[in-house]
């Protein structure tokens, strides 16, 4: 495909394009079955009006500000969403020998996912092994999610969280996609190095 650099506001795309990142026929069948179950899901509820926002710390509050601007823009279009803000800068960091951690953020994300959220949106630094330097979302975190029937769409305005064309990698986002009846139902993510400005343009 072609690379597109977003430098100004554009209309929404006319056609949604995605892929099932299956490496085997068994994985493809598993994902198709998961999509069918999601479409026929009977667990209707308030969770389908819930949007959860996670924003990285540091960088002069850039990621927090980006999330706030996107939420403000959404509110001008509809007031039907409930916004849960899990910004790292709103929580107290714990200092360890290996650096800072945010255990309360890890816990809050876990609770938000398990109680149900339509979208889990992250803005900040990351890679295919974790989101944030403090790993508020990691493989072990995502594997522990027990959210059957309440699968979120995950959006990560971050670096290479989903390098689908690198066979040697094991992206945690794909792992969450492939989990049976838990994890996530869809993922919007980059597969290469990206920058905050373009991330925000797409996320918005």
Per-segment meaning from a language model:
Residues 1-204:
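Cysteine-dependent hydrolase recognition
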